[in-house]
């Protein structure tokens, strides 16, 4: 058995793999890959997927749930276009690569982008606390979890401006209050399902109010809210697999139970990092992610030796991003606790070798 700590696409439950693979061969007489998105069987899939999102996250009345394509990278543009108002000013909290990409897209569509807080001064190893949002901002945008640097907002920022969040890498991993947000978007391939679909949760009152002179029909969230995500052919298989994964999530206690499991896994690994003299955490303690744990070796001369050891034990995907170096253990919902125990045992064994 391989233990997948890769940053994404994410590990999924074996039950989901099995059901999805069976549907590729036979989904009510056809393959899920060839069924029409207008067929009642797939309409039922889409309806269930939307309802599962609402149930899992306790989405209140007055919000629309939408499945699109393009990943969070398109979400940077969609969010900026749809939330543009008369001031054409947007505040962003800069916590790393994905925040900077979102800021760049907002500039391209015509916003004056205001960096209201940043952790760039320490290579993004903490979450900035002194967030000062310009009162004229159309919205405040932030990335809730940073896969590359291993930081995560424990508490969501407060603002009088509408709040937008890229939750691609921690959606469904912990409880949130959806009512705090005007717009949430998330690529599927971290906790929701396979790559190919993107989730949007948008406040209905925010729809149809963009002042952008250039808002194509497809990029207008109102288009998709009115058509129940069926304006054009949706990504049928990714939506189906995501629906299966959300079924599995709810069958196993929902987001509340997933959060407890995720916190247990993270605590186990952080405890080893903090107490093993051969390793050190890359992130300040209060802001450590429970999804993507970044750590370094105290003696880089032994890197090859440690790499050989963890690979020998069928651990995969541990190499850190070049921006940080070291190691990154991505521990999404479906990663079993046993996989974390194997990693911790490998680290203990490495330390015992002196």
What name fits each language-model region?
Residues 164, 178-189:
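Conserved active-site segment immediately N-terminal to the catalytic lysine
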Residues 84-100:
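Conserved PLP-anchoring active-site segment centered on the Schiff-base-forming lysine
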Residues 2, 328-354:
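PLP-dependent enzyme catalytic core of the Aspartate aminotransferase-like
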Residues 279-309:
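Conserved PLP-binding catalytic core of the aspartate aminotransferase-like
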Residues 29-75, 82, 97, 105:
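Conserved N-terminal alpha-helix of the aminotransferase class I/II PLP-enzyme fold
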Residues 106, 118-171:
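Active-site phosphate-binding strand-loop segment of PLP-dependent enzymes
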Residues 188-270, 284, 353-354:
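Active-site C-terminal subdomain of aminotransferase-like
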Residues 2-50:
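A glycine-/small-polar-enriched, mobile loop at the entrance of the PLP active site in fold-type I
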């Amino acid at each position: 058995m391989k233990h997948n700590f890769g940053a994404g696409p994410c590990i999924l439950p074996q039950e989901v793999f099995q059901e999805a693979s069976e549907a590729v061969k036979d989904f009510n007489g056809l393959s899920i890959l060839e069924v029409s998105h207008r067929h009642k069987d797939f309409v039922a899939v889409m309806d269930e997927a939307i309802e599962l999102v609402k149930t899992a996250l306790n989405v209140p009345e007055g919000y629309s749930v939408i499945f699109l394509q393009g990943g969070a990278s398109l979400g940077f543009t969609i969010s900026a276009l749809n939330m543009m108002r008369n001031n054409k000013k947007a505040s962003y909290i800069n916590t790393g690569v994905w925040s900077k990409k979102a800021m760049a897209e907002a500039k391209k569509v015509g916003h004056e982008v205001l960096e209201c807080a940043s952790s760039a001064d320490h290579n993004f190893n903490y979450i900035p606390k002194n967030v000062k949002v310009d009162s004229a901002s159309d919205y405040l945008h932030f990335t809730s979890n940073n896969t590359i640097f291993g930081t995560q907002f424990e508490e969501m920022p407060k603002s009088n401006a509408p709040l937008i969040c890229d939750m691609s890498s921690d959606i469904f991993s912990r409880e949130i209050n959806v009512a705090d947000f005007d717009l949430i978007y998330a690529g599927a391939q971290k906790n929701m399902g396979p790559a190919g679909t993107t989730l949007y949760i948008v406040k209905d009152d925010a729809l149809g109010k963009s002042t952008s002179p250039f808002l194509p029909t497809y990029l207008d969230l109102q288009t998709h809210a009115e058509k129940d995500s069926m304006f054009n052919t949706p990504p049928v298989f990714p939506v189906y697999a995501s629906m299966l994964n959300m079924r599995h999530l709810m069958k196993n206690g929902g987001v509340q139970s997933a959060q407890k499991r995720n916190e247990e896994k993270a605590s186990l690994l952080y405890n080893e990092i903090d107490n093993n003299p051969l390793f050190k955490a890359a992130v300040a303690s209060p802001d450590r992610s429970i999804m993507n744990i970044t750590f370094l070796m105290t003696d880089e001369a032994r890197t090859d030796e440690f790499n050989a050891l963890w690979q020998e034990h069928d651990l995969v995907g541990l190499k850190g991003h070049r921006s940080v170096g070291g190691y990154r253990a991505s521990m999404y919902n479906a990663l079993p606790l046993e996989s974390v125990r194997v990693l911790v045992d490998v680290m203990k064994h490495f330390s015992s070798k002196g």
